[in-house]
Amino acid sequence: MSAPNPKAFPLADAALTQQILDVVQQAANLRQLKKGANEATKTLNRGISEFIIMAADCEPIEILLHLPLLCEDKNVPYVFVPSRVALGRACGVSRPVIAASITTNDASAIKTQIYAVKDKIETLLI
């Protein structure tokens, strides 16, 4: 795999990437996940996004770079993971996924895990 794009900031380390992908997989099973850059944009505009995950190996990366700007406007944490293929697998689809959004649900079974990951992502952004 080539080196991640320098525009992909903040990039999660291996341990955090694994934790993020685990939460993504559980959220996908609970229908609490939106896949793709367009759907992630919609969740941000509607204000129902907990955090945004993007793939750093997206080519060209510019097709994703409107998301960090929107996230900062809406005060939503965002993070890059190294692989779009791994993100696609975690989302439960057979295709690569370049962006995903964990959506808000107060009655969620994985609420504590979502908040734990969200806090770690927020510390990366500082």
Swiss-Prot record:
Protein's cellular compartments: Nucleus, Nucleolus
An example Gene Ontology CC term for this record: nucleoplasm
GO MF entry, a single one: RNA binding
Main subcellular location of this protein, as a coarse class: nucleus
InterPro entries for the chain: eL8/uL1-like, H/ACA_rnp_Nhp2-like, Ribosomal_eL30-like_sf, Ribosomal_eL8-like_CS, Ribosomal_eL8/eL30/eS12/Gad45, Ribosomal_eL8/Nhp2
Effect of R84A: Impairs binding to U4 snRNA, but not U3 snoRNA, and causes pre rRNA processing defects and an accumulation of unspliced U3 snoRNA
A Pfam family that the UniProt record links to this protein: Ribosomal_L7Ae
Superkingdom of the source species: Eukaryota
Alphabetical keyword list: mRNA processing, mRNA splicing, Nucleus, Ribonucleoprotein, Ribosome biogenesis, RNA-binding, rRNA processing, Spliceosome
UniProt entry tagged with the keyword Glycosyltransferase: no
PROSITE patterns: RIBOSOMAL_L7AE
BP terms from Gene Ontology: box C/D sno(s)RNA 3'-end processing; maturation of SSU-rRNA; maturation of SSU-rRNA from tricistronic rRNA transcript (SSU-rRNA, 5.8S rRNA, LSU-rRNA); mRNA splicing, via spliceosome; snoRNA guided rRNA 2'-O-methylation; spliceosomal complex assembly
Function: Common component of the spliceosome and rRNA processing machinery. In association with the spliceosomal U4/U6.U5 tri-snRNP particle, required for splicing of pre-mRNA. In association with box C/D snoRNPs, required for processing of pre-ribosomal RNA (rRNA) and site-specific 2'-O-methylation of substrate RNAs. Essential for the accumulation and stability of U4 snRNA, U6 snRNA, and box C/D snoRNAs.
Summary of subunit composition and partner proteins: Binds to the C'/D and B/C motifs in U3 snoRNA. Component of the U4/U6-U5 tri-snRNP complex composed of the U4, U6 and U5 snRNAs and at least PRP3, PRP4, PRP6, PRP8, PRP18, PRP31, PRP38, SNU13, SNU23, SNU66, SNU114, SPP381, SMB1, SMD1, SMD2, SMD3, SMX2, SMX3, LSM2, LSM3, LSM4, LSM5, LSM6, LSM7, LSM8, BRR2 and DIB1. Binds to the 5'-stem-loop of U4 snRNA. Component of the ribosomal small subunit (SSU) processome composed of at least 40 protein subunits and snoRNA U3.
Stated family: Belongs to the eukaryotic ribosomal protein eL8 family.
Protein name: 13 kDa ribonucleoprotein-associated protein
Species per Swiss-Prot/TrEMBL record: Saccharomyces cerevisiae (strain ATCC 204508 / S288c)
Organism ancestry: Eukaryota, Fungi, Dikarya, Ascomycota, Saccharomycotina
Gene name for this UniProt entry: SNU13
